[in-house]
Amino acid sequence: KRKYNLLVGERTAEQIKNEIGSAYPLDKPLTMEIKGRHLLEGIPKTITIDDSEIRDALSECVATIINALRVALERTPPELSADISDRGIVLTGGGALLKNFDKRIREETGLPVSIAEDPLASVVLGTGRMLTDFSLLRRIAIE
């Protein structure tokens, strides 16, 4: 929107993020044709964008997540810090689906990072386990 004055819908924005969005440079550059409404001319327009442009657009959100991760790591009890150092960070949720997000976090933190087998379902399943067994939550709670 800012660079091309092109307005796209939420579904298109999500598709762009999923297809060519990344948190860290890709091995092979990707491009995508985007259709939307030109804000100044008011007419439909098609442009071609590449993954680096989307990475730039996502950079502020990615940086916010990484800063929140740093804060959480700083507040982590020593015993849990040792586990994280040994086992690493497991990405879950929709953010884990962003290409190379694991590489970016690994570079920023120096910790091993992996992606859950089913990132979307793992959030729900983990929350369910915490709700049924509060002792799990107590073991990792940050005060």
Where are the regions that the model predicts?
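Phosphate-binding glycine-rich/basic clefts of nucleotide- and phosphate-handling proteins
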Residues: 1-59
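Active-site lining segments that contact anionic ligands and/or coordinate catalytic metals
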Residues: 29, 44, 86-87, 110
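Charged, alpha-helix-enriched surfaces in structured cytosolic catalytic cores
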Residues: 3, 7-11, 53, 57-60, ...
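Acidic, glycine/GT-rich loop-and beta-edge segments that sit at the periphery of enzyme/chaperone cores
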Residues: 6-9, 13-14, 129-143
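Glycine-rich phosphate-binding loops at beta-strand->alpha-helix junctions
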Residues: 21, 81-105
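Phosphate/ATP-binding catalytic cores across multiple sugar-kinase/actin-like superfamilies
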Residues: 57-84, 130-133
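Conserved phosphate-binding/catalytic loops in two-lobed NTP-binding clefts
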Residues: 103-128, 137, 141-143
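Residue-level signature of catalytic and energy-coupling elements of molecular machines
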Residues: 16, 69, 91, 127
